[in-house]
């Protein structure tokens, strides 16, 4: 579960409040608070307020209302994956096999993105195929600073693997 510090209205600054980012208005992108407000959130994803921080009296450029810093947790996405990929804890590549089916998350997840399946909720049939309804998180892509010269991910958390003959 990814945690993000962001800004919400005073009315939304309640622990347990859930909200979904539908889109980001163009007016927000020129606001000085954008980077700490909607700039950290992803359209199509849902969040839950888990901690409230002290307010510094900032106001929203659009509503004029006070905004409050909160810690929000990204909630899992509910969608379809083929049955052969539906294993709790598995990290799989979303291929969009369910495109056109009800509950297909193809408007949120792009084909080729890695997802981690949290829980299998049930089964469904669409287009003569069996799918599992699952809760999952989209795994974040590595930061540009973590990419090497050829665009491959370099994990700096462990030493390089060396192959040595056994003695």
From Swiss-Prot:
<protein>
    <recommendedName>
        <fullName>UPF0179 protein Pisl_0688</fullName>
    </recommendedName>
</protein>
<dbReference type="Pfam" id="PF03684">
    <property type="entry name" value="UPF0179"/>
</dbReference>
<comment type="similarity">
    <text>Belongs to the UPF0179 family.</text>
</comment>
<dbReference type="InterPro" id="IPR005369">
    <property type="entry name" value="UPF0179"/>
</dbReference>
């Amino acid at each position: 579960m990814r945690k993000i510090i962001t800004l919400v209205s005073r009315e939304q600054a309640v622990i347990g409040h859930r909200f979904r980012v539908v889109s980001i208005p163009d007016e927000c992108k020129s606001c000085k608070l954008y980077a700490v407000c909607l700039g950290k959130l992803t359209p199509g994803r849902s969040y839950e307020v888990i901690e409230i921080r002290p307010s510094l009296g900032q106001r929203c450029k659009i509503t004029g209302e006070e905004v409050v810093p909160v810690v929000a947790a990204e909630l899992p996405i509910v969608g379809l994956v083929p049955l052969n990929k539906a294993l709790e804890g598995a990290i799989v590549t979303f291929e969009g096999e369910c495109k056109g089916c009800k509950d297909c998350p193809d408007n949120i997840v792009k084909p080729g993105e890695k997802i981690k399946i949290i829980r299998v909720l049930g089964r469904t049939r669409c287009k003569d195929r069996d799918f599992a309804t699952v809760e999952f998180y989209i795994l974040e892509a590595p930061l540009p600073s973590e990419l090497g010269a050829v665009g491959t991910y370099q994990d700096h958390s462990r030493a390089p693997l060396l192959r040595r003959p056994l003695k």
